[in-house]
Amino acid sequence: MALPRKNRLTTKKDIDNVFKRGRTVKGSFLFIKGFNNQRGYSRFAFIVPSKYVSLAVDRNKIKRILSEEIVKTLLLGSGYDTIVVIYKKIERGRFKELREELKETLLKIPNS
């Protein structure tokens, strides 16, 4: 299931704002930048660099896995702008570990 349009960070201005103002939490595969957006609903962006995941098919699969986990855990109403960035190479067999990694890392984001 895809993220609803209102829950996506789409403009460069919004993404740059999160990188400037957001707090960073690191996991073993990914890091998350996020801050309180005062909107009442959360918006997300997923960045998977080709440096770490070379095939576009795999990059898209990772983005789908991450977005499905966000929708499944119903984190859409908490009021955060959040960017999830992959920063280490991931082999195909380890994509499922991303779900757990995302859950654990999201819980570490401090409320501000």
Cite the ranges covered by each PLM segment.
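Positively charged, solvent-exposed patches that mediate nucleic-acid binding
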Residues: 1-112
